[in-house]
Amino acid sequence: MLQSTLAGEPCQNKHDRKSGAHPSSSFYIGRGPSIERSTTSTVRKREAIIFGATGAVGSELLRLCLDGSRYSRVTVIARRPTSMTHEKLQWVPAEFNALEDLATISGLVDGDAYCCLGTTIKAAGSEEAFRRVDYHYVLNAARFAKQSGVTQFSLVTAIGANRDSGILYNRTKGEIEAAIIAMDFPSLNIFRPSLLKGKRAEFRLKEEIGNWLFLLMTPLFHFGLQRYKPVEISKLARALYVSADPEHKTISPRIFESEEIQAY
């Protein structure tokens, strides 16, 4: 059954067959646009759901959603609460392998869902555990969002996402992209950042090494390697938030490559 706590803290085209995988029957440039637009009493405020709000990207995105005027309510679905408190914040404790237990709030969301779930093989402990989070849990989140009436879904994957890749990480990211594209959300944004740069609750050695290597390679970014430059976590969160503004919509699905995210 649904349990919610207000003010707790806790979260390329559709025909591009190379961008991701087939749906599974299993259940988981310059400066960017201005971050907020004025609202009037005639504009109905939207609602938001965030999956993964306790992670580095999700927590930064949550702050933007709460501080901005776009949303009247922000629902975080997570196993544990975040450290933030706000009158618009609603925390719904849940396990991502059992989101069907939350079916009681279906149809109550008039707005957007953001999915910032993700891990690494090392952090997950095995390839199977990694895939459970990055594919099945993400797919569960998207299904739940769809059933809840969400009209716009924003998904974070990674640079190099490709369902035909021989690398498990890239292949899994590509497969989940394709599965969610097939769900046919009215509006879908997919973000493919390079390595993420910023403060994390957990230490990721490979990302830290990668960030140092890219720092040494900075001069090469002017020679075609810009897309591999590490992305600030704050920029990714801003890109997620700004792109969800209805006034900024263009095509769907819209894929934001890493160099585009750098512009925010």
Feature locations, PLM:
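Oxidoreductase cofactor-interface core, primarily capturing Rossmann-like NAD(P)-dependent enzymes
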Residues: 67, 163-264
